[in-house]
């Protein structure tokens, strides 16, 4: 018995906490970026990589209708997967939960790193100079990082096969591939105008 996948609410509550934390961490880093980080590290376009959230993040909107809609929709999908997994496909919920939660785990590693780097930049502690990221470079880097997590989850799945880890592999592969494809179609400009 596994408490995260054998009952519905622990996994759903974990997902809500991670998804909410992701949005708030993004806004915190975006605020730090505008508060001075952009003079040392400049990103082409929006700080946010996900087009769906760019307007809300650019406006530093703490309560976003888009976020609420996406959260309600994703919780509804998890509840539906739970119902299906009890009736027909026993591993559907664990797979879906893994796809959501393990992608968020990868994203949270990025948030922790950015919070550390941005705090050091704002404190003028250990970082000097200026670097500019074209949008295509930022997307490619994100894609590679997500593919790295997919392979780490795959290694864990090879040691202990289960639907939760399989979901994490597929979720990270999918999002990583999307970012890589968007990077290939993106601009490759050298100069980046800070926001």
Which residues fall in each region the model found?
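Hydrophobic alpha-helical segments at protein termini of multi-pass membrane proteins
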Residues: 1-195
């Amino acid at each position: 018995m596994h408490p995260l996948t054998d009952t519905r609410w622990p996994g759903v509550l974990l997902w809500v906490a991670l998804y909410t934390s992701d949005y708030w961490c993004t806004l915190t880093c975006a605020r730090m970026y505008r508060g001075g980080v952009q003079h040392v590290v400049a990103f082409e376009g929006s700080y946010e990589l996900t087009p769906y959230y760019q307007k809300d993040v650019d406006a530093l909107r703490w309560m976003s209708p888009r976020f609420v809609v996406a959260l309600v929709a994703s919780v509804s999908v998890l509840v539906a997967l739970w119902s299906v997994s009890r009736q027909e496909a026993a591993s559907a919920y664990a797979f879906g939960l893994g796809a959501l939660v393990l992608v968020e785990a990868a994203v949270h590693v990025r948030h922790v790193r950015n919070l550390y780097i941005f705090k050091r930049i704002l404190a003028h502690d250990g970082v000097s100079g200026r670097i500019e990221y074209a949008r295509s470079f930022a997307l490619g880097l994100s894609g590679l990082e997500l593919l790295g997590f997919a392979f780490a989850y795959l290694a864990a799945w090879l040691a202990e096969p289960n639907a939760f880890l399989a979901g994490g592999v597929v979720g990270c592969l999918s999002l990583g591939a999307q970012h890589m494809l968007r990077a290939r179609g993106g601009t490759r400009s050298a100069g980046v105008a800070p926001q």
